[in-house]
A protein has these predicted regions:
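P-loop (Walker A) phosphate-binding loop of NTP-binding proteins
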Residues: 198, 210-211
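Hydrophobic positions on the alpha1 helix immediately C-terminal to the Walker A/P-loop
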Residues: 218
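NTP-binding/hydrolysis catalytic cores, primarily Walker-type P-loop NTPases
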Residues: 361-427
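Conserved lysine of the Walker
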Residues: 215
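Switch/coupling sub-region of P-loop NTPases
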Residues: 203-205, 221-347, 357
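Active-site phosphate-binding and catalytic loops of NTP-dependent enzymes
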Residues: 72-82, 126-147, 230, 333-340, ...
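N-terminal accessory targeting/assembly segments
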Residues: 1-137
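P-loop NTP-binding catalytic core
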Residues: 99-201
């Protein structure tokens, strides 16, 4: 039923737009609800005439909600994600569904679609109404990358795998504060106080770690330390930060999202282009959700040219490994910066690198800040840095006893923070 009604809603929408009417998502949902009621009434009249009992009001409501979920939500995926402990969902075809939980469990979940064809069709409908531009999903566009209405991130592929595959990642702690991350064991009060002061002092911060290490969650928490009236420009492949949803905490936010090319290969807007656009919008801070290509150069330029307090995330296997990763991105960018030039740009732009680690423990998945490194200078083919916090096995990151640069200490002192922390240091 949902497919037929979806086609009817799409036809009504297209006709309305063609006649010059503005059609919102709420308008489409309202129209769909009225169509569903009409269909159910027709079914009830037919069943009664055939001597079959009609649906109860509760069953009617369940059918209406299921149809609306299928058309405007993510269907069964939404029902899985309703469990607050669910972190990841990975489906191989319609019926091989793995669910990963926050406590470390990984279990087979329920079948999500009746067939692989229905799975592809549902994903195609999700892409058609995703973000600010329709995203295709077919043999000519074999990957789909979008954000679900619930805020979870979905990636799907077809035609290049034996069966269509879907991976969904959800940020369970969308509004976590530094204090809440401290209480959950991500770091102790010394790191909490240092990071909060670093944000207030407008140090440029790069968050690093592997997939699912908690980089976006920590980035949101750091941004929670900014003044509510600061103008933030966020730049992402897919909107995950969603700072505008927290209007009391972030009152002046411009959220920018990259756009894929259309079927003619036109209309693409890259992260690098968005960074350049964002710099023209009077930002107080520029935030790049994930640096992974040529956007690294305009981002570093933004950090070194007056947009102090900017932040971004990057995939890396260690805090020191970030420097090699950025150099690789710089040499692949259109500017083709060599290692010496990229190191000089990085050293003039980034103040701190915060590295997050993760590991499976008997009590579940643990995520923690494993290292904080201060960038000191560029020395030809090497970036000089000091590891100022380090986590030993089984412990929180603690001060290493290495002093900060005088310039950094002055900026921190100006916001009321005294270095070094007074607790015991790691030897």
């Amino acid at each position: 039923m949902a497919q037929g009604i979806g086609d009817e809603v799409a036809g009504w929408r297209d006709n309305a737009i063609a006649s010059g009417q503005a059609v919102s998502g709420a308008d489409q949902r309202q129209f769909a609800t009225s169509v569903i009621h009409d269909r159910l009434r027709q079914i009830a009249e037919r069943d009664i005439s055939n001597g079959i009992g009609a649906l109860s009001p509760e069953e009617d409501s369940a059918v209406i909600q299921a149809a609306l979920d299928d058309m405007f939500g993510a269907g069964m995926l939404d029902r899985l994600l309703a469990d607050p402990l669910v972190e990841n969902v990975d489906a191989i075809g319609c019926d091989r569904v793995w669910v990963s939980y926050a406590d470390g469990r990984k279990e087979l979940g329920p079948q999500l679609w009746r067939s692989d064809a229905e799975m592809i069709d549902h994903l195609r409908r999700l892409g058609a109404r995703s973000g600010q531009a329709e995203r295709r999903f077919d043999n000519a566009a074999v990957e789909l990358n979008l954000q679900l209405p619930s805020g979870a991130r979905l990636f799907a592929v077809m035609a290049v795998t034996a069966r269509p595959c879907v991976s969904v990642r959800r940020h369970r702690k969308a509004t976590a504060t530094l204090a809440e991350l401290r209480d959950s064991g991500t770091f102790d009060d010394r790191v909490e106080q240092f990071l909060a002061a670093a944000v207030r002092a407008r140090l440029n911060i790069l968050l690093a770690g592997g997939t699912n290490a908690g980089k976006t969650t920590l980035l949101r928490a750091l941004l929670g330390e900014t003044d509510a009236r600061e103008r933030l420009v966020t730049i992402e492949d897919n909107r995950e930060l969603n700072l505008s949803a927290f209007g009391d905490r972030h009152q002046d936010v411009v959220e920018m999202e990259a756009r894929e090319p259309n079927t003619e290969g036109e209309g693409e807007v890259t992260l690098a282009e968005l960074v350049r656009m964002g710099l023209r919008m009077n930002p107080s801070r520029v935030i790049v959700g994930e640096v992974r290509g040529s956007e690294v150069i305009p981002m570093l330029n933004a950090m070194s040219q007056g947009n102090d307090g900017s932040m971004c995330t990057i995939h890396a296997s260690s805090s020191e490994g970030v420097f090699d990763r950025i150099a690789a991105y710089c040499v692949q960018a259109p500017e083709r910066l060599d290692r010496i030039a990229s190191n000089l740009l990085l050293a003039n732009a980034v103040d701190l690198v915060v590295f997050l680690a993760q590991a499976q423990t008997p009590t579940g998945l643990r995520r923690w800040v494993a290292s904080i490194r201060e960038v000191v200078a560029a020395e030809d083919h090497h970036v000089s840095s000091n590891e100022i916090f380090r986590a030993e096995p089984g412990s929180h990151a603690a001060p290493t006893g290495v002093p900060l640069r005088p310039q950094t200490m002055e900026r921190l002192a100006a916001v009321g923070y005294s270095w070094p922390p007074t607790l015991q240091v790691v030897q």
